[in-house]
Amino acid sequence: GGAALRALAGGAQAQDYDLTIAVLPSPHTAYLKMAETIPDRIAEATGGKVKITLNDSLVGGPQIAAAVRDGRVPMSSALHTYLAAEEPRMGIFNLPGLIDNMPEYAYVCEAFWCEDVDAIWLERWNAISLANGAWCTQQLFSKEPIRTVEDFRNKKLRVHNPQTAALMDALGAKPVPLALSEVMPALERGIIDGLFTSTCYGHGQEYWRLAPNVQNWGLGPINGWAILINKEAWEEMPEELREQVQAEMDRFEGEAIYGYYDFVREAMLDMESKGVTFWVAPDSEKARIFDPQYTQPVYDSWYKRAEEVGFDGKAYIEKVRQTLGKDLLR
């Protein structure tokens, strides 16, 4: 018996680090499909010394970063957008017309933004960011078509960040903050007329059954996520293990970024096979929605929050625009 117990204890020692990663329940999304690869990848990269278990019922979305900060969970796949009110740099991709697609997101990330955000994760959330990715292209799922600027008027739309809320206000819509678990009943009961969400998330939740109009207005099309680990949990690992984990998470990030459109395509093709029609706003209508009378209030509220947090918002946005060459458009 003693030998068997010692063998068990030995096995436990070989399995040096046992970590749980909190994720949002989100079937069919790039976010979850990528996260599901982490346990096997890290076990292989560390020779089984780091064991990671996925859990989708530990923490709600808005708490998913704070839970890591407070040590309630050692790891999570966190969403920047939920923190955009608190820290505006987490919400740059929600500003209309700033970051229009995945290549632009990846470019700005690589240029300076991800490094800036890594420092914020560490300072404000006591977390090390191991990798970045993004949700599939944001779409507007609605019961009735919303295909002109006028169509937004009085529509009750669920939004997930303050920038989109400010834009909806300017357009005469009624932005509604709503927990994800309440979206389906709210659609059923007419509490909301539609919502902005990722293509893949909307596909997995089957929102198209109640909101069959799926429209791409190009409003904050890319929404990021980050794989976080609590600073103390990270520092408990010996350096060699940390290097193995980080090298694997660098590969993971490459797949999340460069394989991004494969996830979007898969979701769109599956929805189309179920009768969903996708609509993309023509440039003429996008030009109307991106008119400064609607977009300026969004930027102004962002600049105001930047000032409260203690950085120069206008200079920050100009840096993004210059990085992407958007200041050169004549």
What do these predicted ranges mean?
Residues 15-105, 113, 119-330:
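N-terminal secretory/targeting leader peptides
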Residues 6-14:
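Sec/Tat signal peptide C-region and signal peptidase I cleavage site
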Residues 1-2:
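N-terminal export leaders
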